[in-house]
Amino acid sequence: MTSKDEAKSSSVEERRRHALDLLPPPANSNKPLTPFSIEDILNKPSVRRSYTICGTAHLLSTAEKPPAAGLPLSSRALLSQTSPLCALEELASKTFKGLEVSVLQAAEGRDGMTIFGQRQTPKKRRKSRTAFTNHQIYELEKRFLYQKYLSPADRDQIAQQLGLTNAQVITWFQNRRAKLKRDLEEMKADVESVKKMSPSTVEAVLTISELEEETNSVRDDSRSRSPQLGLSGHMPLSPSSPLTEQHTSKECSEDEEDVEIDVDD
């Protein structure tokens, strides 16, 4: 009796196992299993393990073959790792690798790409200023004295006359008007500062300017008189002075002594 009961029970267990093996996988088989080890609780999983699991899961997913119902539990657990989380980890790893490569290239100066792949806009180069000749500046200044703003006809005439372009003439007159405006503002500020000064300081400034003018005039007079002096540094003598008469008489006597007289035999 006991042997028959054991045989019946073993056959029942085999039928149950066979029925369980024939059952389809559960609906939430794609959901990854939540580990409860100490390392997983402390959030310190090994990187190699996650990458290997995701890599094998990716290979199994690319095969595009549904798992058979009679697979063992180990293969089912491996297939259960093919989850969106693994795909997200793989995508993130590729993204960070690309960012590292772009950062290294930017540091080495290989490419003008920024970290996020946007090309840097080159800086605009400033245009070189036109070098006007002295004749051109003289003619432009002379025209600016009585005409601050030019009509199109006048602008064309000046440009053709001086060998310039219309843009160069326009730019010169704009800069000249701006310079005149700055000069007027500086003069106005100087007048306002003089008005705020006390009378004593104004008198002191005037006396200093007068002294400077006097010293400059004295220097000019001394320079104008210096060529009239002789090489020896003495004043030139007038022809009617006694010193000149003595000097001429000495020269005449010396000439008379040097002259030889021829006597006939």
Swiss-Prot record:
Residues 253-265 have a biased composition (Acidic residues). The keyword Cell membrane does not apply. One of its GO terms (molecular function) is DNA-binding transcription factor activity, RNA polymerase II-specific. The keyword ATP-binding does not apply. Pfam families: Homeodomain. One of its GO terms (cellular component) is transcription regulator complex. Residues 125-184 bind DNA. Residues 1-20 have a biased composition (Basic and acidic residues). Keywords: Developmental protein, Differentiation, DNA-binding, Homeobox, Myogenesis, Nucleus, Transcription, Transcription regulation. It is found in: Nucleus. One of its GO terms (biological process) is regulation of DNA-templated transcription. Residues 1-33, 212-265 are annotated as: Disordered. Transcription factor that controls hypaxial muscle development by down-regulating myod1 and cdkn1b/p27, thereby allowing myoblasts to proliferate before the onset of terminal differentiation. PANTHER family: TRANSCRIPTION FACTOR LBX, TRANSCRIPTION FACTOR LBX1. This is Transcription factor LBX1. The lineage of its organism: Eukaryota, Metazoa, Chordata, Craniata, Vertebrata.
